[in-house]
Amino acid sequence: MLQLVLAAPRSGSGKTTAACALLVALTARGLTPCAFKSGPDYIDPMFHRAVLGVESHNLDLFFSAPQTARALYARHAAGHGAAVVEGAMGYYDGLGGVTDTASAWQLADTLDLPALLVVRPKGASLTLAAELRGLTAFRTPHHIAGILLNDCTQGLCALLKPMLEKETGLPVVGCLPPLPEAAIESRHLGLKTAAEIDDLQHKIQLLSDAAQQTIDWPLLHTLFDRPAPAAVPCTLPPPRVRLAVARDAAFCFTYAETLEALRENGAELCFFSPLADTALPDNIGGLYLPGGYPELYAARLAANAPLRTAVKSAVQGGLPTVAECGGFLYLGRTLQDADGTPHPMAGVLPGQGFKVGRLVRFGYARLTARADSMLFRAGETLPVHEFHHWDSTENGDAFTAAKANGRQWACGFANAHLYAGFPHLYWAGTSLPKRFAAAAEHYIKETS
């Protein structure tokens, strides 16, 4: 089974486009690949899903213990002929920007997988070799097994390949040529989502077609084939309660592992669109409003008054509810759009969402509960992350969030039927899904 971590010396090297090109090319070669993403990123897995038509999974060593990450990898790699784990940021960049904790390198080390390094050679030649030698000397073992030159012509690849192999001892498996027509646009939270790019499949197909011609596939298999990991089968229990889960262009930031954890605890997930649907799904015991881009769709969300009213009535009536980041903004009184115009939202919470124009609170943190609530017990601490350019006039004070550098702030609303706040939660391997499902079951019994 071909297995690799696709990493890079730094962000902006083209890891996501390279991953998608490899995934489509591997599919064309009959290997039925699966995809993973190192770290908390929501958007890159959307590209993997758009390319493959199957779930892509996050593997994050800040959120998860090593054994949990290994189990998730083994479970979702089972039955596939190839697995591509896309790294985040630079290869060794981890928690706080000054450690290798939760880095792509640490994930490669935890999973015992070789890494394929995506390198853009523009503006350097022999210096690339010096940089690569530094990367291989920085940690032992470094796990780097090969180099893929990105945005590199075949002529330049032919020139650089023998020099790089001689100077670094690392094989060059080929290149991905410059393809301006396959460029993928970005926005304030990174790349645009896969659903927003009409010609995504065409762009990825161009990259895949190029990869078929410019990558040494026998060499790739020699370097990265290894026995498939042993997986423990997961059997889902019969559903005991229905949960409404928002899913559309405005609310698209969900972890596949979170949804799986809910199903493993007896939840049937009923997806709905706050943009298009005028009512919540029937017979639900809970509501999950994930993050996304509600600020870009504020006018449309406001125009759907029946759904806003239904959500307000349900939450105020005690429906167990989880609202993360964008979902939290939706529960507020108003939300500014990208132009700064405020629009009415559900009005469950007192805050008004407004545009800041820069990252407000960014990165990993640890969230500690100040009191018992639906999801948390007083004093419990859970790893979370934040990533947003909008803020609220009322962020709540049910929790204390703390970063590794010592910075702390109060945040979040919580009670016996609610969690709402900017911090994104990762549910796999925690008590959260069990508690949410139990609260939903209790609600159904009490209201039946």
Kindly give the residue locations of the regions a language model identified.
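Cysteine-nucleophile active-site neighborhood
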Residues: 294-371
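ATP-dependent carboxylate-amine ligase catalytic core
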Residues: 2-111, 119-143, 151, 155-158
